[in-house]
Amino acid sequence: MTAVQTSGAPGSSSSIRVRGQATINANAEPLYVIDGVIVQGNGASGSSFGLGDALGNGSVSTISPLSTINPADIVSMEILKDASATAIYGAQGANGVILITTKRGKAGEAKFTYDGMFAVSQQNRRVDMMNLREYAEFYNELVSVGEIYDANAYYADPSILGVGTNWQDAIFQTALQHQHQISASGGTDKVQYYVSGSYMDQEGTIIGSNFERFSVRTNLDAQLKKWLKLGVNATYSNTVDDLKLADGEAGIVFSSLNSIPDIPIYDVDGNFTSETREGLGSRVNPIAMAMLDDIILKRQKLTGNIFADVTPIKNLTWHTELGFDVSHSKSETYEPMVDLGNWQRGNNETRWQNNTNTFWQLKNYLTYANQWGKHNVTAMVGQEMWESRWEYQSIYNTKLPSDEVHNPSLGAGTPTIGSGFGSSAMASLFTRETYNYDDRYYLTYTYRYDGSSNFGPENRWAGFHSVAGSWRFTQEKWMENLEWWSNGKLRLGWGQTCNSNIGGYAWGSSISPMDSALGAGYRPANIANTAVQWESQTQWNFGLDLGFFQDRLNLTVDLYKKVSEDMLMSMQLPSYMGTQGNGSSALAAPKGNFGSIENKGLEITLDAHPFVGDFQWDSNFQISFNRNTLVALSGTTAASIVGYGQWSDVVCVSEIGKPLYNFYGYVVEGVYESLEDIENSPKTAKHPTNGVYNRANTVWVGDLKYKDINEDGVINEQDRTDIGSPLPKFTFGWNNTFRYKNFDLNIFLNGSYGNKVLNYSLMNGPSGGLASMRSAWVNQNNDAIKDRAQLTPIDPYKVYEDGSMWYNDITNVKVANSGTKTPRPTLNDPNDNDRLSTRYIEDGSYLRIKNLTLGYTFPKKWMQKAHFDNIRVYCNIQNLYTFTKYSGYDPEVGASTQDSSGYAYGVDNGRYPSPTTYSFGVSLTF
């Protein structure tokens, strides 16, 4: 399993993949089940709450439904990976299942617990950008080589300048967090209870961002009769997110990096400032954007279930359960008028959106369990049905009377009102049988028959099987004398699951409004495809469990192969079908089943307990290898699926026979170091046909030299190729816990190896990327500046009678720092040096000290005098340090939502970086 934190914003989610990427376009996140109830909306994007524009198209942040849950209520998490385990969840378990169990009461006197925590978070890493002195030197060089004609008198002597404005330091803050929980548990032999209430307030490390949560939980179990048990699980949460446009080329992070250091944050009166300067364009003050623009998301969520266990006769139990998940959210955005130099916003604007989601789930199943001698048998048969409904209403308006008024109904502009609704439903029958002989031989069979409203009437139902067997060979007589070998088990499993995560009514054609010269009208929003059907998944799993020395040393090995067929995705159609255009005219392509994906891998877990007694050491090491391959694409003539960036840049492709999401671009071989080098190399698009070179309009010395992949002597789009995979070769985690008497120390390391990251911020932006060096008014990464191709005259004494300069004479220009792979600075960039290439692909491998916790539990004799059952204090550091070669903030980059296709992975477009958090906590039980 790989878990990638998509954003460092408080309340954000992780992108989790269980045994690889099993689908290309349908939801690839695992199923979360809390106390038997399915969690709705795993990692929803901001657009789901009406925040798509406010959070930007380049956003990789997602709003986590798990952020509404108090982690202190959780007692265990179990990950179901192989098909024999997930098959009972049918269509919902194709991407794996994460089972979360919360705390329950136990018989005995009431116990009260207080858990408190205070934390401080910081961004300890900085991207190496130019300070004012370095920027002045760079500006002067552009003047010296003719890229800029007007020198700036303020930069005449860079040595007397200071460092200027450090915009990174300005947007980051030391963020405070505190969390408090009070819980009570206890009960009698008949009734047990657990109740809790918690509050958390967490500042983000980007100024203005914040997350606040209040939650309560009640878990109740009552044995009313010998044959009847009732239970209730319920939790309510209320959260408020103060979000910021952090990600993407228009986000605060990128704006802070590309803002030049000679602009102050505030003027002499303490007001936000910007700059009025030719060439700067609509330059945003990132501090003003963070503090002036409001993006608020308020959520309320009620989740739980009511269940009963009835035992009418011996060995037979009937379980019935009604689950529910009801949520309401309100998003509010407000952008005030702005008059800050080149940054102008003529009108204020606001948008409100209300979302309501209602989910109910009904389960009934009978379980029969019996034992005859050494034979143990269980048989279960049941049904499940659920329905999920959603609706929203939104209103947008401009020209509000003042910045204190955010109600869109009071705006003087023309209001825009939107609404929508939809639903999905599923009905299922399932059965599972298990057989165990003498704790040696095990067999399990599972079958599930699902019907989903996400498909048309002809393809609504599908059935899926799984079977698994295991042999505990250490129970055999011939193993009795090997006392040091405590456990040995072979496992083999095969199973089918399915995927229906394409949304309700995706098989039909929806209606969308559109404006025309004749007034309002309606059009089809998408092309229908009633033939779309289930995406199926078949998985083999072979496992080996070994235990030695009374299980003080345990080894678990799993080999698996998982094949997904009939992939759910949008059909690739030519533009003449009407599938391209703006939002008011584009006709969405139909959903269909196209192709297959294969994941195969190896998982190894080593669990050891080397020391026991006063000093104890528990160690757990896990490593996972996964190979992902796009096996086939059917129903389309396309050989690959292309993911697009913010400006329709091709960033990645998924080609048959290769892993998904490979980056797609040019291979940089170096730079042209002389005219002779240009003439002896394949011709570029800007190679002069008449032989006359021009520094501003044709290829030039110092421009990038790209590899001629197809060897046709020309550099063009046919020379783009696979330039790296964002998927790791392996991931790993190592957890160590040391205990000495009352002290405990936990150290958790994790990492990833072999994955590449596209540092998109270096390549592209409104006025150029952070390493493109094609603008004098965009700050640049120091690594690029230091390694740039430095042009120098071959003959510095050559005289030009027409008054020309050496840098305009290609016969007299060479690169001084031979061997560099970074181009010359050029404002026109005729060679397109900032096109996607290996120059922007970096090694994303890392080793991270993820968690370090030191705790102390007070001795029992001390606690008894204070009338406490338990007192524990601890300090913790999260994300202490990351060992990596990646030049950005954080190499942990997952799926990107910068395009609705969802085909991009490992693209760092200025994401909200993950902070280092220092915390101190106390737990009291009495």
Task: Enumerate the language-model features and the residues they cover.
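Residues on the lipid-exposed face of transmembrane beta-strands in outer-membrane beta-barrel proteins
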Residues: T102, Y114, I182-G186, V216-A222, ...
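Short acidic/polar hinge/loop motifs at secondary-structure boundaries
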Residues: V37-K81
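A beta-strand signature from Gram-negative outer-membrane beta-barrel systems
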Residues: M1, P71-T113, Q177-Q179, Q192, ...
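Extracytoplasmic beta-strand/coil segments of soluble accessory domains associated
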Residues: M1-G46, S76, T86-K103
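Surface-exposed loop/interface segments of Gram-negative outer-membrane beta-barrel transport/assembly proteins
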Residues: A28-E29, I34, S45-G46, A107-G164, ...
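Transmembrane beta-strand segments that form the barrel wall of outer-membrane beta-barrel proteins
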Residues: G116, G197-E203, L443-S452
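Short, glycine-/polar-rich solvent-exposed loops and beta-turns at beta-strand/coil boundaries
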Residues: V4-S12, Y89-A94, S209-E212, A246-G248, ...
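Conserved C-terminal beta-signal and adjacent last beta-strands/turns
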Residues: D618, S725-Y753, L836-F883, R911-F926
